Amino acid sequence: MSGPSMHPVDVANRVIDSGVAEAPHNRVTHQLSVIDDDLAVVESFSHCWIIRTDEGLVCFDAGGVRHGADVVAAVRSWSDQPIHSLVYTHGHLDHVGGSGAFVADAADRGHTAPRFLAHEALPARFERYRTTSDWNVMINRRQFGGVRNRQDLGIAGNGPKFLPDDVAEPDEVFRDKMTLEVGGRTIQLRHARGETDDHAWGWDAENRAAFTGDFTSWVFPNAGNPQKVQRYPIEWAAAMREMLALGVERVYPAHGLPIVGRQRVEAVLGDIAEALEHLAGRTLE
């Protein structure tokens, strides 16, 4: 079994290479693992990836509402540097709900608050969540209620408001691409539609690494259900093809395990693309 003490890369390599689907793949431990020089991940329901630079930390995603403080505590077990920037890969609550804890941590330490970055469609999502708060609470309880009751993951909109008041608004948004340069590191943020219309992913060309958010999640791609807003399986598949064309050799997802090695990346991203293309094609036939 792939228990929390096993390094996530070791678990992923064994699963992909053997074809044996050991569980769990999404380990909600709030523990930090060092993945590479100056790179770590906190495994939560939605992970937080952290890049250490000479100018501070760059994070991808903030974790969920209930566990933002746990995620921050894990980050602080590794580095006391200020958090320079935090990228929202998209606006789902399990990715943005913990952002208030990051802002509070900066205030407690006397640091400048992180700069929050997102795709330009994300603020409209936040506004929609506020306008339709009760409805979002209801549909997420239907989707995740059983999960929440078993594991207390806090992903079902269980507070008085679906989007908490302390969730940080993005300070800067982009449309297609944005270059993030921090402390000698360059990450290109790219937009593609997939599970959401506001999805961003990060491309670290120097290390051939992609921070993929929910484009990869170690489950069948969540291409939609009747109670959710439109999702984009054809564009999602195209994003997988784009990553492969760029030469990605490392995939760092928001759910599940890191995928390291070009052959493994080709297998996983190729399978996701083919599954989505098949799903869309057969549905439209």
Where is each model-derived feature located?
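Active-site metal-binding motif and surrounding structural segment of the metallo-beta-lactamase
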Residues: P24-H25, E55, R66-F116
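Conserved beta-strand hairpin/beta-sheet module of binuclear metal-dependent hydrolase folds
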Residues: H25-S79, W201-G213
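A short catalytic or substrate-binding loop motif that flags glycine-/basic-rich loops and adjacent residues
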Residues: S33-V34, V42-S44, E172-V173, E181-V182, ...
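Metallo-beta-lactamase
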Residues: L57, R66, A124-H191, E235-M240, L244, ...
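Short acidic, glycine/serine/threonine-rich loops at helix termini
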Residues: G97-A101, F126-T132, P221-G224, R262-E266
